[in-house]
């Protein structure tokens, strides 16, 4: 499996990441159970993660802000952020189509609500407010990379994936997907028994298949 080189210009323009002169890259630190514990970015800033006993991510911390997550089975239900000054953002509730990982709506504690329109694969394409105004849209290429950089208003990508703007990775329940490389940053937890000789690959054909838990690839 070939890992694509880092596109520094894209990361700098879209994520605001600046590279050190001596070329320091990304650093990944892992827990003993194989879950990603921390990312040190090329600019030296750290992003840390915490998980519950089932391996579901419950916290993400970056630059003095911690985002908390509450789950409904294997899909996120609530999220909210708080800063070091104890300021909390409005809680967001995510609704999904029944028994799927396809997001259907975003509800904000202040009363705002938005409907989410997805394609045949369950990938969100657009979001609309109560008045029917389009407030967000995205278009992904075959690897899940965004053709145009939208806001993080709706963080979901391929079905089961949640984008972390701080790292450019997509959290995929049991693994993290790198859209720039077109694969996962860690091996399949069951190794070669998963039937993927690369150990890091995504699904065979992303035009018709999805990996909702990060275990199918």
Residue ranges, per PLM feature:
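Acidic/glycine-rich beta-solenoid
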Residues: 1-114, 133-135, 141, 148-157
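A conserved catalytic-core signature of glycosyltransferases
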Residues: 91, 171-172, 197-198
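Short beta-strand-alpha-helix junction that forms the catalytic/metal-binding core
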Residues: 196-204
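A motif-centric feature for acidic-aromatic and gly/ser/thr-rich catalytic loops and repeats
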Residues: 10-11, 106, 110-174, 180, ...
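Short glycine/serine/proline-enriched coil/turn segments at secondary-structure junctions
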Residues: 86-87, 165-168, 193-194
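Short, conserved catalytic or interaction motifs in soluble domains
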Residues: 41, 130, 179, 192
């Amino acid at each position: 499996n070939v890992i694509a080189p880092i596109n520094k210009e894209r990361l700098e323009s879209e994520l605001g990441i600046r590279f050190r002169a001596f070329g320091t890259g990304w650093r990944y630190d892992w827990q003993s159970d194989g879950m990603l514990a921390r990312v040190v970015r090329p600019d030296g800033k750290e992003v840390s993660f915490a998980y519950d006993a089932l391996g579901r991510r419950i916290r993400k911390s970056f630059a003095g802000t911690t985002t908390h997550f509450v789950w409904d089975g294997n899909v996120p239900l609530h999220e909210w952020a708080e800063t070091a000054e104890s300021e909390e953002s409005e809680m967001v509730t995510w609704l999904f189509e029944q028994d799927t990982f396809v997001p259907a709506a975003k509800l904000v504690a202040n009363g705002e609500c938005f409907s989410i329109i997805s394609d045949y694969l369950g990938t969100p394409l657009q979001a609309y407010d109560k008045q029917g105004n389009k407030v967000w849209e995205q278009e992904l290429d075959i690897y899940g990379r965004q053709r145009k950089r939208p806001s993080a208003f709706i963080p979901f990508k391929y079905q089961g994936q949640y984008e972390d703007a701080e790292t450019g990775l997509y959290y995929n329940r049991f693994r993290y997907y790198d859209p720039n490389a077109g694969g996962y940053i860690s091996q399949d937890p069951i190794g070669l028994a998963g039937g993927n000789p690369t150990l890091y690959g995504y699904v065979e054909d992303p035009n018709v298949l999805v990996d909702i838990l990060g275990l199918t690839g």
